[in-house]
Amino acid sequence: ADNAGTIQTGDNGIGIYSKKLSSGPSTVNHSGTINVGNADATGIFLEDGGNLNFSSGAINVGNDSYGIVVVGNSPFNYTNTSAATVTLGNGSTYFYSNNPTTNITNEVSLNNPSGVGIYGISSPGTIVNNASFTLGDQSVGILNTGTGVATNKGTIVVGNSDTENKNYAIGMATTTGKVINDSTGSITVGSNGIGLFADGASSQAENNGTINIAGDSGM
């Protein structure tokens, strides 16, 4: 599937849907614009692996929706560059995967300092972030949901936590794997924010870079 034009999805809609072929993996090349609706809408949905090339173009995501979703267990490859752009509404996620083969090196920056409850990357595979994420209150930069390693080499800024409702602002988090803020990495959190969060018997958090606590009671 190749998209160099403009796609508009409604609420709970999907812009591009791709599924593994009987003859092998499918490939999506996106260099156009996808405007994603609200309420669990998705820009690009890849089922059972495949290849995604997002080296230019844009994905503009509404509220409580997703830019890219990857599900299944077959091998998945993601190529992206800093020329690609993603905008996110409240409660939305740039990249979500439940595919353990997902190995993502991210170059796409995110910038919504007033957005609430945004997730940058949520994936069980290996994650390397080289880009800048500036997100608002109750947001999470990188969530490692697997047993692998997520590494931040870029900049992650999140706002304040809502501790009363247990909605936290976190730079990087995991309950089963490892999160690393690399020597070139920088994480900044607001009031009651958490720079690195590892909660689980086998989880680990490692800081080799800079963590800035910009608000009261952060950690």
Q: Model-flagged regions — what are they?
A:
Residues K20-L21, S123, T174:
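Extracellular beta-strand-rich solenoid/capping regions of secreted or surface-exposed proteins
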